[in-house]
């Protein structure tokens, strides 16, 4: 597995993810083109400014993109936390890519002392995401509603102390 910095070459991957009903069912449905463009620009700006980390997940060197991994700060209740997100397209799911990408991003965050803890908010309806959080050593916290690009998501809050 390889993580590459997100670039304009990955815009098609964002469109693939955000327009796939299987991937977006829990997130308010597929995004219209203008919203996809806004997300693409946000991911690129986060990468270029280093405010957040956005990586393209590839199964191997030179392979087509299989998904995205993010680590960025977000407001949460009365605080700012660091959130980890991994999205792998259906054709590449169940191959361990999300787990491997998450481990790599967490290891880098730990090495660079980017944060003291990492949070994840997988949809309650995703037992695979919950199993991944548990396998990575995250502690299960509370159920909550989170905002995902303007859509309300019923999620489970997980946290990993680095």
What does each of the following model-derived ranges do?
Residues 27, 37, 42-45, 68, ...:
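Conserved, charge-rich beta-strand/loop surface module that forms ligand/interface-binding patches
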Residues 23, 32-33, 45, 138:
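Residue-level marker of structural boundaries
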Residues 1-12, 16-22, 54-162:
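Acyl-donor (CoA/ACP) binding surface of acyl/acetyltransferases
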Residues 8-15, 33-41:
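An amphipathic alpha-helix signature
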Residues 43-56:
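A short helix-loop-beta-strand connector motif used in the catalytic cores of GNAT acetyltransferases and
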Residues 33-37, 45-47, 88:
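Juxtamembrane/interface motifs at transmembrane-helix termini
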Residues 25-30, 42-43, 128-133:
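N-terminal start-of-chain detector that recognizes signal peptides
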């Amino acid at each position: 597995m390889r993580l590459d910095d997100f670039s304009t070459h990955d815009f098609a991957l964002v469109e693939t993810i955000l327009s796939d009903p299987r991937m977006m069912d829990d997130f308010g449905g597929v995004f219209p083109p203008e919203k996809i463009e806004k997300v693409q620009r946000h991911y690129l700006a986060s990468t270029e400014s280093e405010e957040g980390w956005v990586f393209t997940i590839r199964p191997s060197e030179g392979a087509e993109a299989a998904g995205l991994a993010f680590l960025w700060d977000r407001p949460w209740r009365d605080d700012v936390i660091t959130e980890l997100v991994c999205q792998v397209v259906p054709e590449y799911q169940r191959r361990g890519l999300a787990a491997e990408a998450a481990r790599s991003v967490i290891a880098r965050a730990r090495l660079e002392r980017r944060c003291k803890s990492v949070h994840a908010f997988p949809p309650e309806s995703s037992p695979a995401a919950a199993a991944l959080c548990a396998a990575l050593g995250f502690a299960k916290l509370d159920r909550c509603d989170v905002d995902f690009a303007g859509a309300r998501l019923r999620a489970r809050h997980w946290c990993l102390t680095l």
